[in-house]
Amino acid sequence: MSLCEDMLLCNYRKCRIKLSGYAWVTACSHIFCDQHGSGEFSRSPAICPACNSTLSGKLDIVRTELSPSEEYKAMVLAGLRPEVVLDISSRALAFWTYQVHQERLYQEYNFSKAENHLKQMEKMYMQQIQSKNIELTSMKGEVISMKKVLEEYKKKFSDISEKLMERNRQYQKLQGLYDSLRLRNITIASQEGSLEPGMIPQSGVFGFPPGNNSKFSLDHIPVGNQGGGDEDVQFRPFFVCSPTAPEPINNFFSFASPSHEAEQQVCSRAFKAKRI
């Protein structure tokens, strides 16, 4: 990049605009825009905003036109000796070169600062990415383990559901059986309750054949022997019934059969004999 392609910028730190029109040039080789130059150099003594140098000389601050007219360029150096013209030109070129060099240093400093900041941010983000990757790997492992646990629970739930359904079917079956037996017992009990209490049918007792319609009347039971004999006979109690079967222990369902219930009712009304 040639020097002519570079544009001078205002050396005021907060400004940094490209200069055009008029500018304020200082003896310490700094240049400012017309706005900040007129504002900063109106105080006495004037101090350079860029390097804080005191500008007390008459020509330490010059307001110059950056694009002079052709008439001005034709007359400003007229009559000067060549060495003076060259000296003025060399100083003007040195000022321009200094400004361009300082601007490049400033841009390189900003670039280096931004690059360092970018590296720090990149390093920080890489650390965060690594940390997040570790967390992500850990979470993936946890998800896999939780999926395995979930599958195990699903399998257990399915097995338990099948067992529960089987238990429900067994319960419904047993409940139906219980209801039918209960209804049957209620029907038998109601039929037996309708029989006459004084007349009890006997079957196969004291030599009477089964199906015999003879009935014992409780009013004709003999009390004792009135005529006397070798021995005095007195009726002793005994039960004319079948022996009662022992009740089953620890049985889930125990139902009495109808014949057993009828036999128990007959036993409750059995004859009692007394031997004298």
Swiss-Prot record:
Coiled coil: 146-182
Cell location: Nucleus; Chromosome
Keywords: Chromosome, Coiled coil, Meiosis, Metal-binding, Nucleus, Transferase, Ubl conjugation, Ubl conjugation pathway, Zinc, Zinc-finger
GO terms of biological process kind: blastocyst formation; chiasma assembly; protein ubiquitination; reciprocal meiotic recombination; spermatid development
EC annotation from Swiss-Prot or TrEMBL: 2.3.2.27
ZnF (RING-type) ranges: 10-52
Reported tissue expression: Expressed predominantly in the testes and 17 day embryos (corresponding to prophase I in females). Weakly or not expressed in other tissues.
Post-translational modification (record): Ubiquitinated; autoubiquitinated.
InterPro entries from the UniProt entry: CCNB1IP1 (IPR042448), Znf_RING (IPR001841)
A GO molecular-function descriptor: identical protein binding
Cellular component GO terms, alphabetical: condensed nuclear chromosome; synaptonemal complex
Residue ranges of the TM segments: none
Superkingdom of the source species: Eukaryota
Catalyzed reactions: S-ubiquitinyl-[E2 ubiquitin-conjugating enzyme]-L-cysteine + [acceptor protein]-L-lysine = [E2 ubiquitin-conjugating enzyme]-L-cysteine + N(6)-ubiquitinyl-[acceptor protein]-L-lysine
Disruption-associated phenotype: Both male and female mice are sterile. Males do not make sperm and have much smaller testes, a characteristic of mutants with meiotic defects. Early stages of meiosis occur normally and full synapsis of homologous chromosomes (homologs) is achieved. However, crossover-specific recombination complexes do not assemble and crossing-overs fail. In spermatocytes, chromosomes fail to congress properly at the metaphase plate, leading to arrest and apoptosis before the first meiotic division.
Pathway of action: Protein modification; protein ubiquitination
Reported function: Ubiquitin E3 ligase that acts as a limiting factor for crossing-over during meiosis: required during zygonema to limit the colocalization of RNF212 with MutS-gamma-associated recombination sites and thereby establish early differentiation of crossover and non-crossover sites. Later, it is directed by MutL-gamma to stably accumulate at designated crossover sites. Probably promotes the dissociation of RNF212 and MutS-gamma to allow the progression of recombination and the implementation of the final steps of crossing over.
PANTHER family per record: E3 UBIQUITIN-PROTEIN LIGASE CCNB1IP1
Complex and partners: Interacts with CCNB1, UBE2L3 and NF2.
Protein name (record): E3 ubiquitin-protein ligase CCNB1IP1
Species this protein is from: Mus musculus
Lineage, broadest ranks: Eukaryota, Metazoa, Chordata, Craniata, Vertebrata
